[in-house]
């Protein structure tokens, strides 16, 4: 066979890769959004220019985007793993909230007693809080037969009510204009990744978590069991894979990662617990996991894409008056195009 005969086949194969379809989906979302901007009487190129400048125009803006991406990555990886194992976990929002609450309790109470050890203690508390909240949902699903979508969605609202109760009660700062706790002691703050900046080590933790999740999913027996359970219940059953163990394990991992996301947000960005501190993070994590086609490593660029879109949109709104909510259109269209592209690719196979 000649090189000329091979080349067209290689080009077709390259164009049919999942990565190419995802990139093309994002491009199409930008094109369609650009048409909507044009219909509104604005220049889409100018709008996108301000988004890019707002996200990358200065180092402080880049820092904001990286800090925002860290919890997105952590929660997104957890959701991606659950969806891979056919566990429809919609509860990352609540797990983040409980993780942030648990970390805040330790940061406030333990600063004087634990000293420098309060930071790792607070992070562990956040992880345990998120894991416990996820475990409750898994237990209800497995013991009472209530579908995980319903359980996890309802528990999101309960989690935020619990956080609100603490902030309006014993943990709330007196005479504050907003429901929040007092500022944490410096020893409870996440270390900075770059000196004299606000960039904390959360982004490193998130990237490492995504890499570890990839290794577990594709290089361990546990990961194989999760993938098998997600691919076929019958195949998993005949292979001796326990669905209950898979569901509980995946929910625990998701709770650990989401709890860590909540802890990182309160210890590294706000330095206190604030009502609504991560509102929408869990649902963004679902979109990020789907945009990444449930691949833990792909969650990294997907989370960065979401985070920098959101930070850049504020600049666009200030400069040319286009609402920052436009990024929701871009995110939504990207997700729709990706899901369509993935489904089309699956039918071809």
Per-segment meaning from a language model:
Residues 1-28, 34-38, 211, 231, ...:
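Cytosolic-side transmembrane-helix boundaries in multi-pass membrane proteins
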Residues 11-20, 40, 83-92, 113-178, ...:
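Short loop segments and helix-boundary regions at transmembrane helix junctions
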Residues 33-42, 46, 50-110, 123, ...:
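Single transmembrane alpha-helix segments in multi-pass membrane proteins
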Residues 252, 257-332:
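Transmembrane alpha-helical segments in multi-pass inner-membrane proteins
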Residues 112, 195-272, 296-297, 301:
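Helix-loop-helix "hairpin" substructures at the membrane interface of multi-pass membrane proteins
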């Amino acid at each position: 066979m000649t090189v000329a005969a091979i080349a067209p086949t290689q080009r077709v194969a390259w164009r049919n890769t999942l990565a190419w379809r995802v990139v093309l989906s994002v491009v199409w979302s930008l094109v369609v959004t650009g048409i909507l901007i044009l219909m509104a009487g604005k220049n889409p190129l100018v709008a996108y220019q301000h988004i890019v400048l707002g996200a990358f125009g200065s180092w402080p803006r880049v820092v904001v985007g990286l800090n925002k991406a860290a919890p997105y990555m952590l929660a997104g990886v957890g959701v991606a793993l659950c969806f891979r194992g056919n566990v429809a976990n919609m509860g990352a929002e609540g797990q983040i909230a409980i993780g942030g609450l648990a970390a805040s309790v330790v940061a406030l109470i333990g600063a004087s007693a634990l000293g420098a050890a309060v930071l790792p203690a607070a992070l562990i508390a956040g992880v345990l809080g998120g894991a416990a909240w996820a475990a409750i949902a898994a237990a209800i699903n497995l013991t009472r037969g209530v579908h995980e979508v319903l359980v996890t969605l309802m528990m999101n609202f309960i989690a935020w009510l619990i956080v609100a109760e603490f902030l309006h009660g014993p943990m709330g700062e007196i005479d504050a204009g907003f429901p929040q706790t007092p500022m944490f002691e410096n020893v409870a703050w996440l270390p900075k990744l770059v000196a004299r900046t606000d960039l904390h080590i959360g982004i490193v933790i998130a990237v490492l978590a995504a890499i570890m999740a990839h290794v577990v999913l594709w290089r361990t027996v546990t990961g194989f069991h999760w993938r098998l359970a997600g691919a076929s219940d019958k195949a998993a059953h005949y292979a001796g894979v326990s669905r209950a163990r898979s569901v509980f394990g995946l929910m625990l991992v998701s709770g650990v990662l989401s709890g860590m996301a909540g802890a990182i947000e309160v210890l590294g960005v706000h330095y206190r617990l604030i009502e609504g501190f991560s509102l929408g993070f869990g649902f963004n994590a679902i979109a990020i996991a789907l945009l990444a086609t449930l691949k833990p490593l792909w969650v990294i660029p997907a989370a960065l894409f979401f985070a920098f879109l959101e930070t850049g949109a504020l600049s666009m709104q200030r400069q040319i008056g286009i609402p920052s909510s436009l990024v929701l259109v871009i995110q939504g269209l990207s997700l729709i195009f990706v899901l369509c592209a993935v489904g089309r690719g699956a039918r071809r196979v």
